[in-house]
């Protein structure tokens, strides 16, 4: 999930291959009766949570976006066939109650949950039950160009294309109203976990058809109708989003009556709003303010090793950066330890490989590029640029301006003159997705706990060809990508791990990026806010959050 942490989306899962069949009776635990709710738990219900983040989302259609800010809303509005248990990396049933996988790994059959209804809102008051036709619509609009829904060329299904889903899935069939069958072109080890990703959320076909018939297709991305624990109420762009509790949710009802998601670009302003009680929970604090926030009696700061990575993309298709010697020189010219001190106040681990060590398959034998200005200058000389060159770095006003200044100063020491170009968030995502940059900051939050989610989605040649791309380095190594494809087709985790270990060696040698940090998740909130978790795959889900009375 891009967010400069792209999610999008993402988060850890204990290999899909262990889940050949889910529980046949998940309703027993997913829908506890009122008699089973303790008096203490009943006290949790009610109240309004005010949550603040630094930037607004770009769409209410989860298939169109990769940025984590958009998923803050859509992740609470929509459901997927399977989901990740809150705060963990474990897969559990969602809109599918159970599934079977054929012995050859090519056929997945899902049994859908009955009695689930799409939201009724002020703009859509029809009571419609979820069924197989909605799954078909949600997938086929991304899979087939003839069923794209939006006007041709108007919108792009970035995640679908970047992950090569049309090459993975051969066909999708509705066997009846409550049974869906996926047939794959070949074994795909992460497939089950991928079905829990936000871009594969299930939308209402009836609602989409209604909008199409009334020439309002664009409203699908502005006024969502899902089956999730919260319903959409209001979106004032760059100001706030309001979500209301879905009283008819198929699973345990949310504790909160309402969630207000505010956009406050300045982190210090967010922190002040937290101090005064104007907001209750915030993301992206100024890390040099965390210590002071922890001293405030009614504020708690949750910290955890996250599933995040942050780096500097070097566009390998641009002049200078198409030379691996230049890319290595840049890596040796940047003191990453100092970068982490300046940017993260120590709330991060030094990045070495494309994904964090909290995911299996991490190559611990690879050592970071050492900070060595003499070596960096020598590499530039070997590349044919003894006096350096001029280039640019893309950043955003709210995301990483301090980091851009640090990189600019570092590269100046080896003769590289860097101009900083600042863009608003939406323009930044568009320009980097099209490859207009030479250098640009990027990041990723794991969508699933599988190396494939980082390596293939962000670094494969296939991803580089899907424009707009998540592969901001436009890295197109055949040797690297071939290993990733082989790993997809193997079900044994040890065999996959061996392939990923080799792939990490190749990308380290090619240096298409500057590894910077594995940031920690740091979330300040009022002490009365309970149940929010910074761990696991699905962050910023509010159905388990409550206000202590």
What are these regions (language model features)?
Residues 111, 143-208:
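Surface-exposed binding/hinge segments that line
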Residues 29-33, 189, 236, 245, ...:
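Detector for C-terminal structural segments
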Residues 85-86, 166-167, 177-178, 188-254, ...:
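Gly/Pro-rich hinge or "lid" segments in bacterial periplasmic/extracellular proteins
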Residues 52-104, 140, 147, 225-227:
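N-terminal lobe/hinge region of extracytoplasmic solute-binding protein
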Residues 50, 131-137, 177-183, 228-229, ...:
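Alpha-helical secondary-structure segments
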Residues 56-71, 95, 122-126, 191-201, ...:
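A structural "hinge/loop" feature
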Residues 97-148, 181, 273:
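Aromatic- and charge-enriched surface segment that lines or borders ligand/interaction sites
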Residues 215-221, 244-292, 417-419:
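Ligand-site clamp/hinge motif
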């Amino acid at each position: 999930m891009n967010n400069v942490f792209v999610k999008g989306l993402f988060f850890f899962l204990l290999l899909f291959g262990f889940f050949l069949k889910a529980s046949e009776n998940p309703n027993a635990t997913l829908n506890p009766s009122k008699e089973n709710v303790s008096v203490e738990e009943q006290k949790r219900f009610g109240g309004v949570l005010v949550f603040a983040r630094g930037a607004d989302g770009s769409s209410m259609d989860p298939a169109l976006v990769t940025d984590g800010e958009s998923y803050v809303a859509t992740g609470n509005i929509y459901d997927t066939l399977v989901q990740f248990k809150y705060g963990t990396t474990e897969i559990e049933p969602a809109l599918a109650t159970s599934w079977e996988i054929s012995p050859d790994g090519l056929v997945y059959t899902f049994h859908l949950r009955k009695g689930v209804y799409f939201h009724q809102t002020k703009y859509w008051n029809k009571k419609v039950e979820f069924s197989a036709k909605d799954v078909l619509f949600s997938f086929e609009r991304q899979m087939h160009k003839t069923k794209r829904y939006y006007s041709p060329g108007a919108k792009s299904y970035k995640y679908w294309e970047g992950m090569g889903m049309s090459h993975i899935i051969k066909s999708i069939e509705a066997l009846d109203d409550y049974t869906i069958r996926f047939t794959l072109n070949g074994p795909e080890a992460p497939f089950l976990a991928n079905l829990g990703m936000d871009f594969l959320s299930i939308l209402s076909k009836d609602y989409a058809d209604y909008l199409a018939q009334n020439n309002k297709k664009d409203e699908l991305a502005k006024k969502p109708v899902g089956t999730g624990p919260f319903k959409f109420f209001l979106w004032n762009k760059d100001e706030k989003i309001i979500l209301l509790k879905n009283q008819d949710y198929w699973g345990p009802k949310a504790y909160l009556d309402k969630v207000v998601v505010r956009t406050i670009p300045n982190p210090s302003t967010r922190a002040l709003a937290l101090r005064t009680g104007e907001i209750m929970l915030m993301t992206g604090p100024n890390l040099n303010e965390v210590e002071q926030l922890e001293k405030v009696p009614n504020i708690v700061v949750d910290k955890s090793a996250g599933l995040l990575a942050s780096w500097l993309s070097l566009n390998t298709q641009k002049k200078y950066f198409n030379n691996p010697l230049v890319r290595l020189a840049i890596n040796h010219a940047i003191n990453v330890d100092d970068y982490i001190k300046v940017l993260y106040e120590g709330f991060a681990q030094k990045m070495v490989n494309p994904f964090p060590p909290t995911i299996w398959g991490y190559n611990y034998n690879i050592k970071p590029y050492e900070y060595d200005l003499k070596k960096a200058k020598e590499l530039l000389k070997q590349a044919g640029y003894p006096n350096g060159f001029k280039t640019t770095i893309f950043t955003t006003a709210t995301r990483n301006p301090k980091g851009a200044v640090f990189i600019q100063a570092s590269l100046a020491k080896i003769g590289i003159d860097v101009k900083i170009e600042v863009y608003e968030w939406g323009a930044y995502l568009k320009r980097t997705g099209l490859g207009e940059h030479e250098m640009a900051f990027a990041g990723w939050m794991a969508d699933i706990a599988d190396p494939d989610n980082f390596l293939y989605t962000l670094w494969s040649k296939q991803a580089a060809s899907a424009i707009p791309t998540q592969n901001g380095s436009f890295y197109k190594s055949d040797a690297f990508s071939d290993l990733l494809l082989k790993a997809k087709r193997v079900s044994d985790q040890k065999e996959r791990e061996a392939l990923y270990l080799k792939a990490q060696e190749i990308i380290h040698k090619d240096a298409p990026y500057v590894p910077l940090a594995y940031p920690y998740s740091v979330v300040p909130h009022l002490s009365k806010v309970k149940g929010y978790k910074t761990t696991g795959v699905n962050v910023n889900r509010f159905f388990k959050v409550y206000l202590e009375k």
